[in-house]
């Protein structure tokens, strides 16, 4: 590691450690007005709902009066969630690393005829090693971005996302380190693979997609927000960032504080003054903090074109 890399690391952690941890959450929440969510009559779809942030969001939605479809890969964890949540929560097993599984989820939702009022694109993975799915894609790209795009576009195209519906995309503060780069999304080089870097590129793309969707569907009164939870003690952090976790474990956020903004956004649906923003601790924040991430040869349109073509490639092969 050279001096330039060390300087970037020190600058990043120096800037964000207090804000992104439980310390920042505890300080800010003292100034918040109390909100009693009322989600009565709403149906939510929460991805990656079997644990961590997704589980907390699904349970909070049920407690607010919503009915919830919880989708995740682990049938065992989904069963445990359903037992805790009660009859207002239904589960569907879906591996969001796979386009085929996500397509089957869309088909099942269409057959049930259940319109979605709130979609939370929460599922995500941060991996140590380069792996590919059975469909030949880098696993974290497929999970963190491609099937988010597929699911959201599919719900809208099928008329399953209600007019006036809400989409919340779960990003990460890691996106602050990188610009939009379509080329970096589906990492082809196993030798040069960095799970942390790949995760950051996927999460930056989520931010760009959110702005794109909001522009495109504003006439239908749909709301699209992207947020990040701060630094939460998730399974991905435990698995892929053990040193980071060991140093900061005592101040990492739990699932409830990490997911608070998602519930608040759904309950209040605030107006977003800036076209581009990422929500964090109940406030719209800038999507760039470093000048180097503002400049990219790619645009929202090139990103959407790439994801659309990637989905079409597998459909044509089938």
Task: Tell me what each language-model feature is.
Residues 43, 50-51:
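Conserved glycine-rich cofactor-binding loop
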Residues 129-143:
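Short alpha-helical oligomerization interface
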